[in-house]
From Swiss-Prot:
Gene that produces this protein: ilvD
Residues at the catalytic site: 517 (proton acceptor)
Function recorded in the entry: Functions in the biosynthesis of branched-chain amino acids. Catalyzes the dehydration of (2R,3R)-2,3-dihydroxy-3-methylpentanoate (2,3-dihydroxy-3-methylvalerate) into 2-oxo-3-methylpentanoate (2-oxo-3-methylvalerate) and of (2R)-2,3-dihydroxy-3-methylbutanoate (2,3-dihydroxyisovalerate) into 2-oxo-3-methylbutanoate (2-oxoisovalerate), the penultimate precursor to L-isoleucine and L-valine, respectively.
Protein name per the record: Dihydroxy-acid dehydratase
Known catalytic reactions: (2R)-2,3-dihydroxy-3-methylbutanoate = 3-methyl-2-oxobutanoate + H2O; (2R,3R)-2,3-dihydroxy-3-methylpentanoate = (S)-3-methyl-2-oxopentanoate + H2O
Keyword Lyase recorded: yes
Co-factor note (free text): Binds 1 [2Fe-2S] cluster per subunit. This cluster acts as a Lewis acid cofactor.
Organism, scientific name: Psychromonas ingrahamii (strain DSM 17664 / CCUG 51855 / 37)
Binding site for Mg(2+): 81, 123-124, 491
Amino acid sequence: MPQYRSKTSTHGRNMAGARALWRATGVKDDDFGKPIIAIANSFTQFVPGHVHLKDMGQLVAGAVEAAGGIAKEFNTIAIDDGIAMGHSGMLYSLPSRDLIADSIEYMVNAHCADAIVCISNCDKITPGMLMAALRLNIPVIFVSGGPMEAGKTKLSDQIIKLDLVDAMVMGPDKNVSDEDLAKVERSACPTCGSCSGMFTANSMNCLTEALGLSLPGNGSMLATHADREQLFLEAGERIVDITKRHYEQDDYSVLPRAIACREAFENAMALDIAMGGSTNTILHLLACAQEAELDYTVADMDEMSRRIPQLCKVAPSTPLYHMEDVHRAGGVMAILGELDRAGLLNSDIPTILSPTMKEQLAKYDIMQTDDPKIIDFYRAGPAGIRTVKPFSQSCRWDTVDNDRAAGCVRSLEHAFSTEGGLAVLFGNMAVDGAVVKTAGVDNDNLTFTGPAKIYESQDTAVAAILGGKVVEGDVVVIRYEGPQGGPGMQEMLYPTSYLKSMGLGKKCALVTDGRFSGGTSGLSIGHASPEAAAGGVIGLIEDGDIIDINIPTRTMDLKVSDEILAERRIAMDIHGWKPVSRERHVSTALKVYALMATSADKGAIRDISKLK
């Protein structure tokens, strides 16, 4: 029988001083012996997805204490990728994932907490918290802040739906008037919550449902909707239940590594592919698998991408649907239900809520249940009122979207495509793999051959695109932007957005050892591994070299002979695999990150072999 971890600091004469300090935080005599639940919040006023989380920790704390636990809240950092985008601030985004994981480990282990409730939402916060949870392997539940409502505005006498990416694309587009741009800017992000499309934040929050570590609706219920409050309250109540089951009933099945097992990671990847999630999710799932000590690789993901169909299509891959529409169609449980009926889901594994995923789907998949409470839950919709307050509205759709032939979520027979929304490419340009969000690639661009235009920073690529130096047929290559080379593996949302602004969105390809925002669409291939700074072939490409991309065959090749590449490699070995000329201040903190970072095919995690 495992002992409560908290007894280390709450029991015995030698801990009189520690108990005195616990008392100073509000712990009373009859509290000692109760499980201590750490509430890892991520409130900040910098990030729309987190601006409303200030009181969420105490909401959960109240539920924890009512259920018989001691709740202690702390906060992690949270970076807004959209605000940090397009300048040196983006160097810090991915490294913050590791800092978040470490900060949770530090707080939870230093204070001997027994379990964790992770209150996350945006891009690096959810994966950082997942890494910590799987590293610590103590009872955990995830509850996120929820998605933003989609924006709406009137352009050319039409009401259109909007999101952040629309504002980014229209900004440099000279065909968009100042008046229309102002309308879009003011309408694109109308409420608190994670940006409204299937971008990285929402993708990751959906994946926590597939991993079995969050409650149904966590990934899709709007931040503004009153129904979301119940997710926080239930998380607080349930964490006490599973914590007592582990420590008092010797139940190891409730631990995160038991729930988020290899089969659960396969479910998460199946969901990711089926819903056309962000390519960043591949990076984060690889990192989380490492923390869980699972042998799960890009090769496994590649195999799945060939047999999992795309059953859901959401912005930025289509303007028709946003997260509020995914929720109306039944959310993550609906997509998992369709995968299960197609024989593509491991449904006999546990979740934090049910003994098996199959039992959970029987209750929460709108195509299986006739429970009016569940149907009502998935009718929760947007109010269309600008606000930063959570739970501020209770609007509902008249009906759920259960149209599996032409709705937001499709059945296998009516899939958007027979292959999924993400793919891994291999070839001499990416020996260890590169990733592309096929959900956002036009069918005419599934194969593409063109000359390389080489840029050794995002900044120079942006200047070239906006300056008219990139033309139809080019393959824009942005290198030395990987985990080591950046350092920090910047997102390339602005280059892809500006290609669209210049009318080149379907006429060019972009390849990088950096990564892409979940808001990216088009023929944008990232995570090329090994990265240039690690000696990858992407560092050997020269202007005018022909690059051949073939998504159906999952290949990406540089049409240069092995002999010429060998000669170039000798020259680069002498040069030191660094940009020929690039002015960039790299802080000491980022240099430390770069020293330990692996390439994207390993999840950009730390190379712990360097510690031996």
